[in-house]
Amino acid sequence: KPNPERFYAPM
């Protein structure tokens, strides 16, 4: 499962 703490969403 993905880690929301390490999640990065580029614009």
From Swiss-Prot:
Q: Which UniProt keywords apply?
A: Amidation, Neuropeptide, Secreted
Query: Which residues carry the post-translational modification Methionine amide, per the record?
Result: M11
The biological processes this protein is annotated with in GO are: neuropeptide signaling pathway
Give its localization. Answer: Secreted
UniProt GO cellular component terms: extracellular region
Record bears the keyword Secreted: yes
The record's principal subcellular location, in a coarse class, is secreted
Which superkingdom? Answer: Eukaryota
Indicate the family of this protein. Belongs to the tachykinin family.
What is the annotated role of this protein in its UniProt record? Tachykinins are active peptides which excite neurons, evoke behavioral responses, are potent vasodilators and secretagogues, and contract (directly or indirectly) many smooth muscles.
Q: What is this protein called?
A: Ranatachykinin-D
